[in-house]
Amino acid sequence: MTILDKRQIQRFASDTDIETLSKAIDDDGVAIVRSVVSRDVIQRLQKEVESSDQPVWLEDNPSLKDSKFPSQARHANNLVPASKTYRDDILNNSAVHTTCKAVFRDVGDYWLTTGILRTTKPGSPAQGFHRDALLYPVLQYQPPTSPPLTVALLVSMTDATVANGATRVILGSHKWETVGTPSEDQAVRAELDAGDMLVIHQRLVHAGGEHTHQAPDTRRMLLMFLTSCQLVALESPLALSRELVETMTPLAQKMVGWRTVRPVEPNTVGLNTHRSGCLEDGLKLRAAKPLEGQDGH
């Protein structure tokens, strides 16, 4: 396998346009968007999740008792009911949606498949190089030239450094036929300031780094996995109460599967419908007022 050059990950402002982000992701398979969320949002999200009366920690889930989680890491999901900040600030974040429109421009609407708040402490081991499309086995049959159907967004809640495990990524590896056996000298580190977002193409070869004892503080990150609306979500919308969903904006409702979505043609009726019409109309679903700049759909 040819060793790629050591170009670094391209970094963009949070108001960068769709076309610019699209080109970077197409070329490199990865990008960093700076200052996507504020420290206030990060602090509120962390507090709400860690104090939630909802079951959030995967390590405490009896159905996952045989899973081998590193003892120095914790993983929280079920974030929609657990955190108002997640529902209001994260699911409506304009930079998140601009990025998703850049990724999914050829396939239509997208939605959230799962969100995970991950913490690591010193001693958390490095991951092996991999791709993120494991949830959907059908994706292994896509050729490298196919448009992506999934994307991973990593929002750093603390600074991400080499010492605390900043992600290793191999630029351009989304164009490889297989993962193969990459070497460390092919990778660069995705060092991030708190609030920055790392964008990972579904085929990009990457790996979390080791959280070394040189970085004694806990590292926190929000991992969001989004897919084309043509793929079913990992976290079922049936688990969300209507009462909770009706406190959310129309855009956030669509992200969690409570509205009709639109892939590209030749589909003309949408997906997730009610009698071939809009689900939200059939349910007479209420919603919070759209945020400024949102179209309410």
From Swiss-Prot:
One Pfam family recorded for the sequence: PhyH
Enzyme class of the recorded protein, top EC level: oxidoreductase
Enzyme nomenclature, EC number: 1.14.-.-
Pathway participation: Secondary metabolite biosynthesis; terpenoid biosynthesis
Alphabetic keyword roster: Dioxygenase, Iron, Metal-binding, Oxidoreductase
One of the GO BP terms on file: terpenoid biosynthetic process
Cofactor(s) for this UniProt protein: Fe cation
Binding site for Fe cation: 130, 132, 206
A GO term for molecular function: metal ion binding
Domain of life the protein comes from: Eukaryota
Family (UniProt): Belongs to the PhyH family.
Subunit structure: Homodimer.
PANTHER family according to UniProt: IRON_ALPHA-KETOGLUTARATE-DEPENDENT DIOXYGENASE ASQJ (PTHR20883:SF41), PHYTANOYL-COA DIOXYGENASE DOMAIN CONTAINING 1 (PTHR20883)
Note: In A.calidoustus, the austinoid gene cluster lies on a contiguous DNA region, while clusters from E.nidulans and P.brasilianum are split in their respective genomes. Genetic rearrangements provoked variability among the clusters and E.nidulans produces the least number of austionoid derivatives with the end products austinol and dehydroaustinol, while P.brasilianum can produce until acetoxydehydroaustin, and A.calidoustus produces the highest number of identified derivatives.
Function: Iron/alpha-ketoglutarate-dependent dioxygenase; part of the gene cluster that mediates the biosynthesis of calidodehydroaustin, a fungal meroterpenoid. The first step of the pathway is the synthesis of 3,5-dimethylorsellinic acid by the polyketide synthase ausA. 3,5-dimethylorsellinic acid is then prenylated by the polyprenyl transferase ausN. Further epoxidation by the FAD-dependent monooxygenase ausM and cyclization by the probable terpene cyclase ausL lead to the formation of protoaustinoid A.
Descriptive protein name: Iron/alpha-ketoglutarate-dependent dioxygenase ausU
Species annotation: Aspergillus calidoustus
